[in-house]
Amino acid sequence: MNDQTPIGSGCPVHQPGGVRSLLGRTNKDWWPDMLATEILTPNGPSNPMGEDFDYAKAFKSLDYYALKDDLKALMTDSQPWWPADYGHYGPFFIRMAWHAAGTYRTADGRGGANSGQQRFAPLDSWPDNGNLDKARRLLWPIKQKYGNKISWADLFILAGNVAIESMGGPVFGFGGGRVDVYEPERDIYWGSEDKWVNQGVQTRIDPAKGMETIEGPLAAIQMGLIYVNPEGPQGNPHDDEGMARDMKETFKRMAMNDEETVALTAGGHTFGKAHGNGDPSLLGPAPAGSDLAAQGFGWVSSHESGGIGEHAVTSGIEGAWTNTPREWTENYFRLLFDYDYELVKSPAGAWQWQPINQKEEDMAPAAWDPGIKVPTMMTTADMALKRDPAYRAISERFRNDHEAFKDAFARAWFKLTHRDMGPKVRYLGPEVPDEDLIWQDPIPAGTKPSDAEVQAVKDKIAASGLTVSQLIKTAWASASTFRKSDFRGGANGARVRLAPQKDWEVNEPAMLARVLDTLDGLRGSLSMADAIVLGGVVGLEKAIRDAGFNVAVPFTGGRGDATQEQTDVESFEVMEPEADAFRNYVGKKKLAVKVEEMMLDKASLLGLSVPEMTVLIGGLRVLGANHGERGHGHFTRRSGQLTNDFFVNLLDMTNVWKAVEGSNDQEYVATDRTTGGETWRATRADLIFGSNSELRAVAEVYAENGHEEKFVRDFVKAWTKVMNADRFDLA
């Protein structure tokens, strides 16, 4: 986190004069409100590794400790094209790893280091990621050497770990398993601003209205920042209250509490320096807008030195935080508290704080010449650790108990760099910690039931009186919390029976409690997690039989049951759906985006394709899975049977649709063209399958004569995919 805000990032788009783009105006240019169905088709043919490549298998063949040795050697192998500060690249790689992981946000689980997105626009060209293109390029010889045995995503984080270790710092462990993608992720919302932080863009917090004014699911304070503006809110270094507010809110949205925030800030700033010893106007465009000959390098300086070493400019802030910038020491807190500070401007014009009357022994060596002494500095964000009462109390405790600080930093760094990897069962490598951590959403290992045990429980559920609707709703409520973004949620653990999920409005708590109580009494030796999914199998197979088909629904047991003590309630609260198109549910909160767009977002998090989303919506409607007794989209006279009636009746041209007056275009009614009588009611999440051309094309397939059984089989396949989405033990 050493360099947050490059000042001269330049325009991210470069178009030589007189040359048109290949495609011209896109559909989205002509119709900005067009549904972005492309987010459900990510990372397809662009992946050169092919579908058969097994990264976990490749990683297990890696000479892990030889790789670590090579990384350690790189730390002090300074290159003339980008010299190492203090002769050590460690701080540079810490910042690279931090910024790879630091884009994570809890609201939707997106961002983070998991897929190596820092290699692609917009992240490779964010102002806050200035000059990290050089850090990645320094790693290339090592990546080239070890090939597909180590992903870029894993290499970024491991390089950060080795950097800390090589400077005497503490680490808690490392888990591999991050799989690279080969194009920018299409399903992530970074904000609607059209200017970067250094181009006058406003903060996302309205102080008059409170911290919640940051638009969900965003976490960073301004466009192009990982966290906060280190100079202060809106660049105002005098706003102490605002600085602490910004830090607390943005770190909270990235899954960090106050203690973790202090530990990460102080620990990260124990190392290295910020760069602002030059004129930012000399910097060229960011990588995404740089010249072809630059070969992916951005922020190239026209300074006679090339803007490297002594003259490097990144954030604009200049200097080291401590007098020992390549060692893990206690000096960060000592210098922060032992000195009074005055506000100064760096050579690049950025606000920073300098110790008053600093002793020579407390000054830092110049990064380019250890024989020169220069003052240390603190950013406005650092000063918040001293000036904010809550942060100060934690900082003073850490200053007086360095072992506690070491442990807190190591654990916070591990959480920062692994938060988006899901449960520990996904971790690879010899340095995975044994300890289970609550933010990993631990689940006790399950026991796979025998076929006889499964059949016995199926028979009991079938005779219990539970309806198809109840069984389908309960299984969906349990499994559909899964997010492929950070691998949280899902049916394993049966957390639908625990707080907070058991009380979510979307889950119909009273109905849910009755069904769970019944299943608990019938499950025998099966886990509740297995019983819930098996209940869905029973309901679905009945619906299939009643529709006249003979299609089995797969079931693989072996799920475990989490306890309330293993469940961080606050971290799960952010996962409560504001809307769920699969259940035709819209909560009381005013939505920031359209229901049909939230449907795509949910489908994307579930890892569904357009056909999978479409077949699930159509099937769930006729199975009675709507929230409550809502009849919208229930286009069938054969409720509880798995038929294609939803699509047949949606596409029936005898219906004329109109928005219900006063519904703000959220509800619609169909009338018969001939009689004028009401036939159906629908929501936006229903009619979009007849309105949007891509979704209609798929809906037509499922409405065609002869495709009735195809619809059933496709529904079963998509349903099973969701039920097993978090079964990493089956991979």
From Swiss-Prot:
Cofactor(s) needed by this chain: heme b
Signal peptide: none
Post-translational modifications reported in the UniProt record: Formation of the three residue Trp-Tyr-Met cross-link is important for the catalase, but not the peroxidase activity of the enzyme.
Per UniProt, location of the Tryptophyl-tyrosyl-methioninium (Tyr-Met) (with W-98) cross-link in this chain: 227-254
Active site: 99
InterPro entries (alphabetical): Catalase_peroxidase, Haem_peroxidase, Haem_peroxidase_sf, Peroxidases_AS
Top-level taxon of origin: Bacteria
EC number: 1.11.1.21
GO MF entries: catalase activity; heme binding; metal ion binding
Disulfide bonds: none
Catalysis: reaction(s): H2O2 + AH2 = A + 2 H2O; 2 H2O2 = O2 + 2 H2O
One GO location term (cellular component): cytosol
Cofactor binding summary note: Binds 1 heme b (iron(II)-protoporphyrin IX) group per dimer.
The keyword Protease is annotated on this UniProt entry: no
Assembly: Homodimer or homotetramer.
The protein's role, per its UniProt record: Bifunctional enzyme with both catalase and broad-spectrum peroxidase activity.
Protein name from the UniProt record: Catalase-peroxidase
Organism: Sphingopyxis alaskensis (strain DSM 13593 / LMG 18877 / RB2256)
Lineage per the UniProt record: Bacteria, Pseudomonadati, Pseudomonadota, Alphaproteobacteria, Sphingomonadales
